[in-house]
Amino acid sequence: MTKSELIERLAGQQSHIPAKVVEDAVKEMLEQMATTLASGDRIEIRGFGSFSLHYRAPRVGRNPKTGEKVELEGKYVPHFKPGKELRDRANIYG
């Protein structure tokens, strides 16, 4: 599901709320989540999961075109850990 599909689905379920308001709310929620992660804080949504930053250590990579070794710097990457309720719901299909 894409962001626009999510907005469309939510707007369809909440017909008393204008689609533009739903779109603005979704965009603001995602912006707040991104800002929180960028500041190094963790986000926990009980029953759904948590978002945090994980450190990826420096390593030696390869340029896929030339095969040349390239030094890659360490960096923080977003990480999502699903909550138990989400894992259980997903396992219905697995």
Curated annotation (Swiss-Prot):
Keywords: DNA recombination, DNA-binding, Transcription, Transcription regulation, Translation regulation. Transmembrane segments: none annotated. SUPFAM superfamilies: IHF-like DNA-binding proteins. Coiled coil: none annotated. It holds the Pfam family Bac_DNA_binding. The keyword Endoplasmic reticulum does not apply. The keyword Oxidoreductase does not apply. One of its GO terms (cellular component) is chromosome. GO terms for molecular function: DNA binding; structural constituent of chromatin. One of its GO terms (biological process) is regulation of DNA-templated transcription. Belongs to the bacterial histone-like protein family. This protein is one of the two subunits of integration host factor, a specific DNA-binding protein that functions in genetic recombination as well as in transcriptional and translational control. Heterodimer of an alpha and a beta chain. NCBIfam families: hip, PRK00199.1. This is Integration host factor subunit beta.
